[in-house]
Amino acid sequence: MAFISGPALPTARVNRTVAATPVRMASGEDTPVVSRRALLSSTLAAAAAALLSAAAPAKADREYGNVGFLGGGDKIDVNNANVRVYGRLPGMYPTLAGLIVANGPYKSVGDLYNIPGLDDKQTGLLKKYEDSFVALEPRPEYEIDKFNNGLYR
């Protein structure tokens, strides 16, 4: 369809005026459109609003200091780590890892050998990886995530 112009298409011309307030501070006119006082006060008000609306720093407590033992470091905290962390130690996940998580908390790494139902192979794995474990104070905020931390591949 071609563009058709002419009397068949009524058009209404609307004259709109745009209110403009140019700032003529250094012009040769005697009367500026915006006074210096108005310009400075509006600039000062905008700067004050920007300063007052700035975000304050968070006053949250520091995250769990031993977070590296939850899977991000070389050692695994047997009282707080998730069952999936043991997957990086061949033979531990899921059976032996599940037993460790289910039977905690432990006062020491040596308490792992007292888990009921351990067979010789599992005891051998515990001995093999004993230096990879640490038994820290159990934290209630990690208790719920021990079996299912909600991270899926």
From Swiss-Prot:
Quaternary data: PSII is composed of 1 copy each of membrane proteins PsbA, PsbB, PsbC, PsbD, PsbE, PsbF, PsbH, PsbI, PsbJ, PsbK, PsbL, PsbM, PsbT, PsbX, PsbY, PsbZ, Psb30/Ycf12, at least 3 peripheral proteins of the oxygen-evolving complex and a large number of cofactors. It forms dimeric complexes. The oxyThe extrinsic subunits in red algae are PsbO (OEC33), PsbQ', cytochrome c-550 and PsbU.
GO BP, sorted A to Z: photosynthesis; photosystem II stabilization
UniProt KW keywords: Chloroplast, Electron transport, Membrane, Photosynthesis, Photosystem II, Plastid, Thylakoid, Transit peptide, Transport
NCBIfam families named among the record's database cross-references: PRK02515.1
Transmembrane segments: none
Any Pfam family the entry gives: PsbU
Superkingdom assignment: Eukaryota
Described function: One of the extrinsic, lumenal subunits of photosystem II (PSII). PSII is a light-driven water plastoquinone oxidoreductase, using light energy to abstract electrons from H(2)O, generating a proton gradient subsequently used for ATP formation. The extrinsic proteins stabilize the structure of photosystem II oxygen-evolving complex (OEC), the ion environment of oxygen evolution and protect the OEC against heat-induced inactivation.
Assigned GO CC terms: chloroplast thylakoid membrane; extrinsic component of membrane; photosystem II
InterPro entries: PSII_PsbU, TAT_signal
Family note: Belongs to the PsbU family.
Protein name per its UniProtKB record: Photosystem II extrinsic protein U, chloroplastic
PTM text: Predicted to be translocated into the thylakoid lumen by the Tat system. The position of the transit peptide cleavages have not been experimentally proven.
